Regions:
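Alpha-helical transmembrane segments
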Residues: 24-28, 50, 74, 91-95, ...
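Extracytoplasmic
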Residues: 102-264
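Alpha-helical transmembrane segments at the extracellular/periplasmic loop-to-helix junctions
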Residues: 1-41, 45-52
């Protein structure tokens, strides 16, 4: 159950829609099977049938999991010359091809000229990334130890700090992801102490609590308590526990050290 709930946060594991597929492949996604079928009927070219089967299969898989989108786009691009050859009038084939790219052009237009809301979201993501790097590199010269952090930040923290993290963005990190969610949602110091000890955690990252609490609650499938640990760790890091010491803080992140031989 935890895997299914966690997978909802991973873009490539989500289902997609025909509109998204058209943004990747254009309207050729609909036209190609028709042209490939026509080409096979007229010339008996089996390659067209192979492309037809691959496009239909990968398009269906992409509707289930977006990670298959790379393949459907690749097969569509490879099949275009074979499919357009079914139309003997080249000018018509080219016109169909160019017009079919309209959804792709619209997608690029949205990417290059985002709305105000999309632009603000991008700016926030960039600011998050800069602040995370600034916080993570502070651990480079510190003693080696495990890092407790929101799971989606763990790969970047490992890269910039050289320290090991409890979680990651892979399903193989799921046990650590679940434990990190338990940690940030918990109010039981005994339980968090057990998590820190079992993973040999030496450093704790605190981040904007609303996102951490909502994501942890979603993955664990339960409602958070009134004041989860994520809240005091970020709002009042120095007073959240006598066993924690402040190492570094910026606008978005707080880095706390677990005193040697102690948990929370």
């Amino acid at each position: 159950p935890a895997f299914d709930r966690w997978a909802q946060n991973i873009g490539e594991l989500r289902s997609t829609t025909p509109t998204v597929l058209f943004g990747w492949c254009g309207w050729m996604l609909v036209i190609l099977p028709l042209l490939l079928g026509l080409r096979f009927r007229r010339d008996r070219v089996t390659v067209g049938l192979v492309f037809l089967a691959l496009i239909v299969a990968t398009a269906g898989l992409t509707l289930h999991h977006a990670r298959w989108g790379y393949f459907v786009a690749l097969f569509c691009a490879m099949a275009v010359p074979w499919a357009l050859a079914a139309q003997r009038r080249r000018w018509l084939a080219w016109m169909v091809f160019v017009v079919s790219l309209w959804p792709v052009a619209r997608e690029w237009d949205h990417a290059l000229y985002p709305t105000d809301a999309a632009w603000r979201a991008r700016a926030e993501n960039v600011a998050d990334a800069v602040a995370l790097r600034d916080a993570a590199i502070r651990l480079r010269r510190l003693p080696e130890g495990g890092v407790m952090a929101p799971w989606w930040f763990c790969p970047a923290i490992v890269w910039w700090s050289g320290q090991s993290c409890i979680g990651g963005s892979s399903h193989q990190s799921l046990p650590g992801i679940v434990d990190s969610c338990e940690f940030y949602l918990s109010e039981s110091l005994e339980k968090t102490d057990a998590i820190l000890t079992s993973h040999q955690i030496r450093y704790v990252f605190a981040y904007e609590p609303a996102r951490m609490i909502s994501n942890s609650a979603q993955i664990l499938g339960r409602q958070p308590i009134s004041t989860p640990l994520a809240e005091p760790l970020f709002r009042h890091p120095k007073s959240s526990s006598a066993r924690l010491e402040s190492i570094y803080a910026n606008r978005y992140f707080k880095v706390l050290g677990v005193r040697a031989g102690q948990g929370l």
